[in-house]
Structure formats: C-alpha cells, structure tokens
Amino acid sequence: MKMSIRTPPRLLELAGRSLLRDQALAMSTLEELPTELFPPLFMEAFSRRRCEALKLMVQAWPFRRLPLRPLIKMPCLEAFQAVLDGLDALLTQGVRPRRWKLQVLDLQDVCENFWMVWSEAMAHGCFLNAKRNKKPVQDCPRMRGRQPLTVFVELWLKNRTLDEYLTYLLLWVKQRKDLLHLCCKKLKILGMPFRNIRSILKMVNLDCIQEVEVNCKWVLPILTQFTPYLGHMRNLQKLVLSHMDVSRYVSPEQKKEIVTQFTTQFLKLRCLQKLYMNSVSFLEGHLDQLLSCLKTSLKVLTITNCVLLESDLKHLSQCPSISQLKTLDLSGIRLTNYSLVPLQILLEKVAATLEYLDLDDCGIIDSQVNAILPALSRCFELNTFSFCGNPICMATLENLLSHTIILKNLCVELYPAPRESYGADGTLCWSRFAQIRAELMNRVRDLRHPKRILFCTDYCPDCGNRSFYDLEADQYCC
C-alpha cells in the first residue's frame, strides 16, 4: 500500500496536539519540538485558551517575530494575557532559554500571511516552502540592541476608552518600560477625550511614529494641546488632518497665535512626504504660514473642502516644497471668482512629476478653463485626472479633451456632464445626455483611443450620489 505524502505532517500534528493536552508540558520538551510545529500548535493553543502551554511556547518561540494581531481577532483576553506572561518570564529570568530568538511582538493590523503559510504547510507537508515564504522581520532602527524586546502596535483611538486588549497591553508596557521598547508607527485619532489621548502619547516614543491621522471635530484650543506632541514626531512621513474648526470664541489674534504655534511644528518634520487636509477651516488666509514651514519636498498634497483666499492659492503656487508632487487634490475648494493663474503656475511647476490631479467641485467655469489648459497638457506623467462637478459647456469640454490628447499615460479621466445635458430646472435630460455622449464618443475617438473616460452627473437629490457613465452610454455606478 502506497503511503500518502500527507501522512508524516498529519502524524506530527496529532503528536503536537497531544502535547497541548499534557498538563505537565515542560520547557525541555518544547526545546526539542520541530520548528515547523510551533505556528500551528500556537494557533491551536491560543484558540483553545491553553494558557500554560502558551506561556511556555512563547518562551521557546523559535522565530524572531511573533505576529499576534491576527490571532487577537479571536476574542480571548485570557490567551493574550498568557502570551504577555510568557514574555514576562523571558524578560525577567537571568538565564535565557537555549532556543530563545524572539525579539519582536508584532501587534500591527496588517495583512499577515505568517499563520496561513505555516497552516498550509502543516496540511500539505510543504515546510520548505513555508520557510522560503517568511517575511523579513521588521525592526525599529532607533532601538536596535537597546532592549531585548520590541513591541509594534498601531493605535486607533476611536472611542472614549481603549478596548480591553490595548488597555491591558499599555498597562503591561508601562510597568516594564526599561525592559522593552513600544514602537507605534501608525496613530489614528477618530474620537477620544484629549486627556486620554495625552496619557497614551506620553507612553509612546513619538520619534517612531510615521503616520498620523486626526479625524475629529477639534476646535483650535484642542489642536493647541496636540501641537507639542506633533513637533516630536520627527520621522513623520504622512499627516492627515480632517474636520478642524475655528471656535467662535477664538479672536482673530488668538487664531493667528494658535496657527503660528501649530505651523511652526512643521519645521521639525523633515521626513514629511504626504500631507492631507480636509475641512480644515483655519487655513483660510493662513496657508502661507504652513507652507513656509515645510522643509521637505512633498509627494502628496491634498487640500479638500476648505475655504481658501486667492492669496492662499498664490502662496501655494510659489511654495518650493511642491515642485515634486505626484498627487495634487484640491477638490471642494471654490475657485469660481478667482484667477486661475496661480493654478496654472502650480501645474507648470509639477508637470514633470504629477500623476494624479483632482479638481472636482471647484466651481470652475468656462471662462476659467483656458488658463490651465497649456500647463495641463504638459503633465505627461498624469495617469488620473478628475474634473467632476465643474459647470462647463460642451464646447469647453471638447476643448479640454483635445488638450489631454497628448497625455499618453492617462488611464482614468472623469469629466462633468456638460451644461447642455440639463433642463432649465437643473434636472438631467437623459435623451439629451445620451446624444451628447454619442457626440463626445465620436469626437474623442477621432483624436485618440482613451483607456477609460467617465462622465458624471450632479449629485442625486434622493441618494446623494453621482452617476458615472462611460462613452458607450452604459451606467457605471450610482
């Protein structure tokens, strides 16, 4: 009888599970356990809450990294506590286990195939492939060699209080701060009293943070409390600010002082590459203060749904830190009554690098479009261009399309349905819109072979969404 090639790993799996049932499981036994058995048996122990086995397996863990976050999705605080107890034993004992390799406890919420790879290897006997498919261990360069253990975590502060896992972890870290390094690379603040945020930020090494998102309805006095912490995030690469408002109780003098305190922190952010600001009301008339403090060349700049003055646009076009932009998003900024010469200058500056341009809902009208066409037609790296929500006529749209003809890298183009598509009451006339699309289809294909062009309607009063149509007159989405 021919033996199946899956028989050996299956026998190993059964043998390993019998170890988990052994209440007298000893460290010496685990030190002789084949490396390939650890991941599947660890998952088994975690899901079945074999706490004593977990403590010992952590101490004998044969890899440098323990990516625990995917397993925490199984609600089991008791098992999580057992893992930390096992780490305690490692950190406090004088003599380390012979097999100890663990250096990183990874609690980041990232796509993780570690457990999947080893589980499939157990099922199919492909342990060699599992070893080849392991991801390199992520280190924190700042703390290399200073502490025996680094704990990677992502902080999502979205409720009034932390979840039970993070609460327990931070308390555990606080009590062992001299034995390990807590590294947080991503911080997202979606809603929490600032006094709670402050206590958490005091525990984190701010130099480690690379991405910050603040999406709260903060007024300027609260932003003032956050400002000193921002200045210490010297390795910050991405900053997202959303829904920052000016309190009606703040005088113009106070506003200027607070904005100055905030923007001067950017002088310290020498790694910043991506800056996103959405519904940030204090930018009006103060954009120059922020731009003058930028010390790096940005790759991404999005200023959306904000009120800007014409002078703000002028300062933006003169900023030296925007000359290498790959992404520029100014959607939702009303430009109807402004000269677009600053925007023309801005596009000329970034023409060599710009790949994504979004000018949706800027209120750009026919008489303004010509100002930006020469500069737009020189953005040869552009692959996505969105111009929805701007009330232009058919002739202007055709002119715009004729200027983008030479942009060979354009993959996605989004344009508004021209004004002729609507009736006197502002509702879309479907028959007229279909006729216009047919005319545009012939016009565009006479000029070039587009990869994807979509025409969008105004927002639907019922569902609040736009409808998108391609050149073939088929509805794309609503």
Curated annotation (Swiss-Prot):
Keywords: Leucine-rich repeat, Repeat, Ubl conjugation pathway. GO terms for molecular function: ubiquitin-like ligase-substrate adaptor activity. One of its GO terms (biological process) is negative regulation of DNA-templated transcription. LRR repeats lie at residues 99-126, 181-205, 206-232, 233-268, 269-294, 295-326, 327-347, 351-378, 379-403. GO terms for cellular component: Cul2-RING ubiquitin ligase complex. Pathway: Protein modification; protein ubiquitination. InterPro entries: LRR_dom_sf (IPR032675), PRAME (IPR026271), PRAME_domain (IPR050694). Belongs to the PRAME family. Component of a CRL2 E3 ubiquitin-protein ligase complex, also named ECS (Elongin BC-CUL2/5-SOCS-box protein) complex, composed of CUL2, Elongin BC (ELOB and ELOC), RBX1 and substrate-specific adapter PRAMEF9. Substrate-recognition component of a Cul2-RING (CRL2) E3 ubiquitin-protein ligase complex, which mediates ubiquitination of target proteins, leading to their degradation. The CRL2(PRAMEF9) complex mediates ubiquitination and degradation of truncated MSRB1/SEPX1 selenoproteins produced by failed UGA/Sec decoding. This is PRAME family member 9. It comes from Homo sapiens (Human). The lineage of its organism: Eukaryota, Metazoa, Chordata, Craniata, Vertebrata.
